[in-house]
């Protein structure tokens, strides 16, 4: 749904609806109807998943038996951010379609419940979002998944809340090569993706920096700070231009050490990183920076 929404920005909403709207609607209804094997929509509008037996998110490091090294389960912050954004995009496409009225009312009811539940569930007194919430357990690890909740088009968080979260991300996770997968102040931080395969697997999401997360970060920054934030975003992009003259020329590595000198690791070229940096550069171009 997020990809189709991005397509609508490059075309228009009616075109996206005509070509892909029903597909997005069917996917959302599939989840609402409880047909997805590992996603469940609760009465509060939030979507829940079971990540105890196998990794369910992009943070998919696993032990030899397949169980996750980072067992994120329950309400995952990025799953829920993308879920609400998808619901609101559907409503944007079909709000005035009388033939879709019953489905629209259903989506609206869930999105309304979600809007009331998200902040009380995820927002903590420290000013950032829990990485996941499972029953009474709230995960305090400072991870970058919360940037998706402030970087998508639709969020129930107000500007003050988004600014506070973004300030926290900037302070704890931002590096010249992307956002760290874990804050240096969180337990288990390891910025070095080195060693044997087992050591690297454990370090994969424990502090390394990911350029692709800058897509959500920079869009969130511009949404919160407006034109005043563009010079900061532009300065961040200059660092990536320099990086593209290192290693594999014209591209970006899979990940980078979370501490200086931020050495590139993993695959020498990673499409998601290149794509999201290009998305930010396009944002700057469209805003004439």
What function would you assign to each model-found segment?
Residues 287-289:
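Intrinsic disorder at enzyme termini
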Residues 179-214:
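Generic long, charged, amphipathic alpha-helical segments
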Residues 1-52, 57, 76-80, 84, ...:
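Aromatic-rich carbohydrate-recognition surfaces in CAZymes
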Residues 51-75, 135, 193-204, 254-264:
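Acidic/His metal-coordination segments adjacent to aromatic residues that form catalytic metal sites
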Residues 9, 16-19, 60, 126, ...:
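General structural signal for secondary-structure boundaries
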Residues 66, 91-92, 115, 200, ...:
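Amphipathic alpha-helical interaction segments
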Residues 32-48, 75, 82-193, 235, ...:
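Catalytic cores of carbohydrate-active enzymes
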